[in-house]
Amino acid sequence: MDWSIVEQYLPLYQKAFFLTLHIAVWGILGSFLVGLLVSVIRHYRVPFFSQLATAYIELSRNTPLLIQLFFLYFGLPRIGIVLSSEVCATVGLIFLGGSYMAESFRSGLEAVSQTQHEIGLAIGLTPFQVFRYVVLPQATAVALPSFSANVIFLIKETSVFSAVALADL
């Protein structure tokens, strides 16, 4: 076997690997934050924003990533918003991943008993402290397997970015 061909293209593979890693890491971190925010809004039923969060989750989960990327890359420039292909890929991954992470967080939040919340309030914690120190750690522990599945899913979805001018992938 002639390994000189592999040697010749190795720098391109390295560049593609690090680009994929860069987009995936930022996309996963952004998805985690968006998912937490959206799930808290839905769980605590914040008026108007709860319905908006539900619409976001349904729209994001029920449209393919490729369609979302085409909208970001080809649709937004028609209204004057031009983003680089890397930014489009990252935003698209955050948009998609945020909805999946939100559902994971929501399942974790619903798994925590209401009694835990009441006990936190009874010992003098503020509602935010109850959420931060009592509810969130338990919800995160329950949702951890789902988070890892979502991370794997998001890394696999980076292969779609080659359709939107990320030819390095």
Please annotate each region the language model reported.
Residues 1-168:
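Transmembrane alpha-helices and adjacent helix-loop boundaries
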